[in-house]
């Protein structure tokens, strides 16, 4: 039986992926993913991470963000990461594999955080996309709402939140909610984010909790 022919959209994505300068740079530098460059650009602009911080990384696999943050917070810092997918170990990262939407996984994650509040919550979570915005955007918004709920539980006063959000229905309301909870809120589109993608990154600092 012959191989199943790829759709035009998946073939285009693969061509874009392997010709992408950030994919090539990540491979050359032995980085986990091109997402490393997105969080690096955000750090250069917004200065979120400092030595000794505790950071929660949601949607962490394959580990690009965690890998970057470990280099910024040093040996006395902590990264607590979670993803439904497997992730190869990273020194300095406490990784929990499981579905963040599951209450048992959430409780296990909260137990790893412990009693102390964290300095930064970051989320690069995204659903499996169907290609139908009417389905995909609500799924994506559900995940970012969960990430914000996590902030409300674990983020220290004056802490920071960075979250990937897909522009569409619910985006403006979500942005308004974040602005009510943080002193300074910016919407970033890093150079390493594909131009055709609806994704942007909300960077919020000065949590009022």
Swiss-Prot record:
UniProt xrefs under PANTHER family: RIBOSOMAL RNA METHYLTRANSFERASE, RRNA METHYLTRANSFERASE 2, MITOCHONDRIAL
Active site per database record: 164
Q: What is the lineage of its organism?
A: Bacteria, Pseudomonadati, Pseudomonadota, Gammaproteobacteria, Pasteurellales
Task: Give the TRAM domain ranges.
Answer: 191-209
Which NCBIfam families does its entry note? PRK11188.1, rrmJ
The cellular location(s) given in this protein's UniProt record come to: Cytoplasm
UniProt function note:
Specifically methylates the uridine in position 2552 of 23S rRNA at the 2'-O position of the ribose in the fully assembled 50S ribosomal subunit.
Annotated residues that bind S-adenosyl-L-methionine are located at 63, 65, 83, 99, 124
Per UniProt, the enzyme's principal EC class comes to transferase
Catalytic activity field: uridine(2552) in 23S rRNA + S-adenosyl-L-methionine = 2'-O-methyluridine(2552) in 23S rRNA + S-adenosyl-L-homocysteine + H(+)
For the biological process aspect of GO, one term held by this record is: RNA methylation
Q: What is its main location?
A: cytoplasm
Q: Which GO terms describe its molecular function?
A: rRNA (uridine-2'-O-)-methyltransferase activity
A cellular component term, taken from the record's GO annotations:
cytoplasm
Enzyme Commission no: 2.1.1.166
Q: State the name under which the record lists this protein.
A: Ribosomal RNA large subunit methyltransferase E
